[in-house]
Curated annotation (Swiss-Prot):
Comp. bias intervals (Gly residues): 672-682
Full protein name: DNA replication licensing factor MCM3 homolog 1
Reaction it catalyzes: ATP + H2O = ADP + phosphate + H(+)
Protein family per UniProt: Belongs to the MCM family.
InterPro entries the record matches: AAA+_ATPase, MCM, Mcm3, MCM_CS, MCM_dom, MCM_lid, MCM_N, MCM_OB
Role this protein plays: Acts as a factor that allows the DNA to undergo a single round of replication per cell cycle. Required for DNA replication and cell proliferation. May act as a component of the MCM complex which is the putative replicative helicase of the replication licensing system in eukaryotic cells.
């Protein structure tokens, strides 16, 4: 024991020398003065300063911290008492924590092996569970009424570094057998809390469960973090015997006894930007086709859906979050939903977001509950205490949550995410726990229509089957349809076949994103930012000429670009952009009020106005601008109009109308007669509004679907079951931008009759 005391004294002198010499020009002495002035009881020592003073001492502190924690605490306490004798009461001491680089002792919960037991480690992860803060008795004081004496007893468990562990027997009688009365007011306690820390989702091994480590925090470290926080905890890794099994069975549970907890920002895993990277980003942002370039670079294995890919790019960039002085929180994250027929690559788009976004968590509607997405109150298996456990949306704070099969979720569970999508917090009031957790994440959901496939004769709201209170929280809602077009089907089949034939030079299959990941492993600053042309991957783009060949960014550079634009660019609205947003919002409201065809996919509310602002800000981020211009608002409105009003049909109709007008003008200039379309032509020689050919029976599939949708919406809106062909012709030509001829109307109605959707007799159409 004397040798132990001598060693402790030597270690204490070593730390006193460190504080006296104070590498860093008085940093630690000033820190001790601030600690005394602010009534704090913990001093953080930097490992770099300790290494500069005594390299051997720093190594021994990391390898055998149990021998040095108490001497370090005694040394700091002595210095504090010299500065202010009244700072510490009798028996009190200043605690010591460590920070700085730990070399290979900086690990994740997955890397904690048995070789680290008994050493000091720095573990980084995300807090998933927090127990309640409980008092732990340090010294009990008892009074004997017979003798009038006081008796005190100290308690130390195996987690303590000061002295040896003591027994937990609570005294009820003194040595003479006299009864003792506990003086609770004179007893001393310390706060105690247990945390569960899990490895961060983006760094966890694919296909494996994330590892978790229990952390014990005491005194001033309690309540310094909450579920969902990313932390770096420095502590001693120890093995403790279980309460039920003990040390006889040889089964121990391991815990991390913390001495310092540091909150990490969300940029802990940020990529490193070189000067060449910044130069290339500026060049990309100055291009006129930056939006199309990023959209085409996202998930090149998915054919088409360019507008949806553009929206996903804006979603990952996000707007600017605002916290006003009056406490109002304006979210900057963008929420998006895709509803459509099966096999239109909705789930594949979600997987693409998982690969590109810096932080993304994936879940499904049927496999998720409301508490699993938000937060839950659970019971500790050993102590029975209540603890707060974070859900998927809390863990994805500052990230993206991908929810597939959104329509399969129960209504009760779906209501739980209403607060997250607008207020971006999770409020829990259960089992005596009332807490509010941050869930500042974007939500991208995919769902199937209520009838399995999308019915064009019904309004979008009836197809989706979700309440308006939830739909209005989505900034964008895309209707993804499986259109039967022979030309498009041919292109999709060729694209899918090329994906399956995409192989390496040696004949083995390889990842579609091989180029991107190869660039990630290459640390060359001059690495190419564009994916090299590959016939199997890019098809026959080169045959169409270099100008039409679509450039695609590598995965590595796309990640860097999105991360840089999202976190380092904070645009602000200009007066011109604000006026244009207000005018556009008024036009959208007016258009939705006068819509006779059932409106668009989303209700136009005040949330739509905020959506325009967020989308415009995201587009300004993409262009690396610090101001939102009118052009950004125009680009945002294009995406919003596409999502709400299916602009793909309108653009096609406008194109066909222009072609028809050009044909009519050419025939008029040539002196042709009978070139006007009066709706009663039947010769088949008149110029018609078709994609290919010139006869009335060659009507495009999109025009047929648009006709059926207009007819179905008119029937539902007016509650009628029959109309004359003349009335139908007038109605569709009044609602459509490109008119239909009489022969086209009759041709489409005959197709609907063959499909048993209508019945035609004597010029009257009865809706079945």
């Amino acid at each position: 024991m004397e040798i132990n005391e001598e060693a402790m004294a030597a270690h204490k002198r070593a730390f006193l020398d460190f504080l006296d010499q104070d590498v860093g020009k008085g940093v630690y002495m000033q820190a001790v003065r601030d600690m005394v002035q602010n009534k704090r009881h913990r001093l953080i020592i930097g490992m770099d300063d300790l290494r500069n003073h005594n390299l051997d001492l720093a190594r021994r502190v990391i390898r055998t911290p149990g021998e040095y924690m108490q001497p370090a605490s005694d040394a700091v306490s002595e210095v504090a008492r010299n500065l202010d004798p009244k700072f510490l009461k009798e028996g009190e001491r200043v605690m010591v924590g460590f920070s700085g680089p730990f070399g290979f002792h900086r690990v994740t919960p997955r890397d904690l092996m048995s070789s680290f037991i008994g050493t000091m480690v720095c573990v980084e992860g995300i807090v998933t569970k927090c127990s309640l803060v409980r008092p732990k008795v340090v010294k009990s004081v008892h009074f004997c009424p017979v003798t009038g004496d006081f008796l005190s007893r100290e308690y130390r468990d195996i987690t303590s570094f000061v002295g040896l562990p003591t027994g937990s027997v609570y005294p009820t009688r003194d040595d003479n057998g006299n009864l003792l009365v506990t003086e609770y007011g004179m007893c001393e306690y310390k706060d105690h809390q247990t945390l569960s820390m899990q490895e961060v989702p983006e760094n966890s091994a694919p296909g494996q469960l994330p590892r978790t480590v229990d952390v014990i925090v005491e005194d001033d470290l309690v309540d310094c973090c909450k579920p969902g926080d990313r932390v770096s905890i420095v502590g001693v890794y120890k093995a403790l015997p279980g309460k039920s099994k003990g040390s006889v069975s040889g089964v121990f549970r391991t815990v991390l006894i913390a001495n310092n907890v540091s909150l990490l920002n969300k940029e802990a895993n940020a990529p490193v930007y070189t000067r060449e990277d910044l130069k290339r980003m500026k060049e990309i942002s100055r291009r006129n086709d930056t939006f199309d370039l990023l959209g085409n670079s996202l998930a090149p294995s998915i054919y088409g859906h360019l507008w949806i890919k553009k929206a996903v790019v804006l979603l990952m960039l996000g707007g600017v979050e605002k916290n006003l002085k009056n406490g109002t929180h304006l979210r900057g994250d963008i929420n998006m939903m895709m509803v459509g027929d099966p096999s239109v690559a909705k789930s594949q788009l979600l997987r693409a977001v998982m690969n590109i976004a810096p932080l993304a968590i994936s879940t499904t509607g049927r496999g998720s509950s409301g508490v699993g997405l938000t937060a839950a109150v659970t019971s500790d298996q050993e102590t029975g205490e209540r603890r707060l456990e974070a859900g998927a949306m809390v863990l994805a704070d500052r990230g993206v949550v991908c929810i597939d099969e959104f329509d399969k979720m129960n209504d009760q569970d779906r209501v739980a995410i209403h607060e997250v999508m607008e207020q971006q917090t999770v409020t829990i009031a259960k089992a005596g726990i009332h807490a509010s957790l941050n869930a500042r994440c974007s939500v991208i959901a995919a769902a199937n229509p209520i009838y399995g496939t999308y019915d064009r004769s019904l309004t979008p709201t009836k197809n989706i089957g979700l309440p308006d209170s939830l739909l209005s929280r989505f900034d964008l809602l895309f209707i993804v349809l499986d259109q039967m077009d022979p030309e498009i089907d041919r292109q999709i089949s060729e694209h899918v076949a090329r994906m399956h034939r995409y192989c390496t030079d040696d004949g083995g299959a390889r990842s579609l994103d091989k180029e991107g990941y190869a660039e990630e492993d290459d640390g060359d600053a001059n690495a190419a930012i564009f994916v090299k042309y590959d016939r199997m991957l890019h098809g026959q783009d080169r045959r169409r000429g270099k100008k039409s060949k679509q450039d695609r960014l590598t995965v590595k550079f796309l990640k860097k670009y999105i991360h840089y634009a999202k976190n380092l660019i904070q645009p602000r609205l200009t007066d011109e952009a604000s006026d244009h947003i207000a005018t556009s919002y008024a036009e959208l409201r007016d258009g939705s009020a006068n819509a006779k065809s059932g409106g668009g996919t989303l209700p136009i509310t005040a949330r739509t106005l905020e959506s325009i602002i967020r989308l415009s800000t995201a587009h300004a981020k993409m262009k690396l601008r610090h101001e939102v211009l009118k052009s950004d608002v125009e680009a945002a409105l294009q995406v919003l109009n596409f999502a709400i009003y299916h602009k793909e049909l309108t653009e096609m109709e406008e194109r066909e109308q222009k072609e028809m007008e050009m044909k009519q003008q050419a025939e008029h200039d040539a002196g042709a007669t009978g070139g006007t379309v009066d709706g009663h032509g039947s010769s088949g020689n008149d110029p018609m509004d078709v994609d290919v050919g010139s006869n009335d029976q060659n009507v495009s599939a999109e025009r047929i679907e648009a006709f059926e949708a207009l007819l179905g919406q008119h029937v539902l809106a007016n509650h009628i079951d029959q109309m004359s062909i003349d009335e139908i012709e007038q109605m569709v030509n009044r609602e459509s931008t490109a008119p239909y001829t009489r022969s086209q109307v009759e041709f489409i109605l005959e197709r609907m009759q063959d499909a048993n959707r209508v019945m035609i007799r004597d010029g009257v159409v009865r809706i079945i």
